[in-house]
Amino acid sequence: VGSEMCIRDSAGAIFGGSAWVSTSAYFIGMAAIIISGIMLKKTKMFAGDPAPFVMELPAYHWPTLGNVLRSMWERGWSFIKKAGTIILLSTIFVWFTTYFGWVDGTFRMLDESEIDSSILAAIGGAICWIFKPLGWGSWQATVASITGLVAKENIVGTLGILYGGGDGTVYQNIAQAFTGITGYSFLVFNLLCAPCFAAIGAIKREMNNGKWTAIAIGYMCLVAYCASLVVYQIGGLITGEVGFNIFTIVAVAIIVFTIYMLVRPNKYLNDNEVKIDVKKVAASK
C-alpha cells in the first residue's frame, strides 16, 4: 500500500498523472526479482542443486459477498490502525522536527523561510551527500526516504509537510523540486530499497537469523541504489540533464556487470552436477 501511494503521488506531482509510471514500477519490481534470482544463483554462496517445490493449489471458486466484505473490512481496519498509530506519530515527529530548530542560538518554532535551520534539515543535510549521485541529494528527499523505513506511506506525508502541504500547492512545489529523471530515480530507489520496519520484522521471523536478515536488507538497499544510479546517470545523459562524469562510468559498469552475470554459465551448478555423477558411478560399482 505504501509503495502504491508513493508511486501514485509521484505520478501525479511530477509526471502529470501518467499511467505508465505505475505500470513501469510494477515491471521494474518484477525484473529486479528475476534478475536477482538469476545472478545470485550463479554465486558460490547461493549455488546448489535445484530443490523441488510442490504447492497444493486450492479449488478456485467465485468469492461470496460475505467473504469479500470481511476481507475488505480486515484490510481496511488494519490500515486505519496503522494510519492512526505509526503513521500519525511519525508524521507528528516529522512536523515537529521540521518547524523547530535553533536560530541565532535560540531553540524556537520556525517560520516557513527558516525551515533550512530545522532539526530535520540538520539530520538530512548530514547524509544527503550519499544520494547526490542519484539526482535527489536534497535534505527533504533524503529524510522522506528515511521516514519510509517506518512505513512507506510516510514518504508521501513527509513530502507533503516539507513541500507546503498546508497551502494546497504541494504538487507544484514537488514538481519544481524534481525533474522527470530525478523524480523517477527517487521512485525507483524507494520502490526497491528496504521495506518498512514491520516487513523487516517479518523477514527476521521467517529467516530466524539476524545475520541473513541484515544481508537481505543490505542487498535490497544496494540493488535500489544501483538501479536508481543507472536511471539518473544514463537517463540524464540521454536527456542532457547530466554531463559525463565518474558516476556515469559507474552506472555503465553496473549495466555491464549485470549483463555478464546473466549470460555467464553457472560454473557452480556444473561442479555440483559432476559431483553427483561421480557419486552415482561410485554407488553403481
Predicted segments with their positions:
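Interfacial loop-to-helix junctions that mark the boundaries of transmembrane helices
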Residues: F15-A25, M109-D116, Q172-T179, I238-T248
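Alpha-helical transmembrane segments of multipass membrane proteins
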Residues: I28-G37, S90, V94, T98, ...
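Juxtamembrane inter-helical linkers in multi-pass membrane proteins
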Residues: F46-S71, D116-L120, Y163-D167, I276-V281
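Alpha-helical transmembrane segments
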Residues: V21-S36, T248-I254
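Long hydrophobic segments that form regular secondary structure
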Residues: M45-F46, Y60-R108, C128
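Extended, low-charge hydrophobic alpha-helical regions
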Residues: I92-L222
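Membrane-interface capping segments at transmembrane-helix boundaries
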Residues: K42-T43, Y260-I276
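Short, small-residue-biased leader/transition segments that mark boundaries at the very start
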Residues: V1-I7
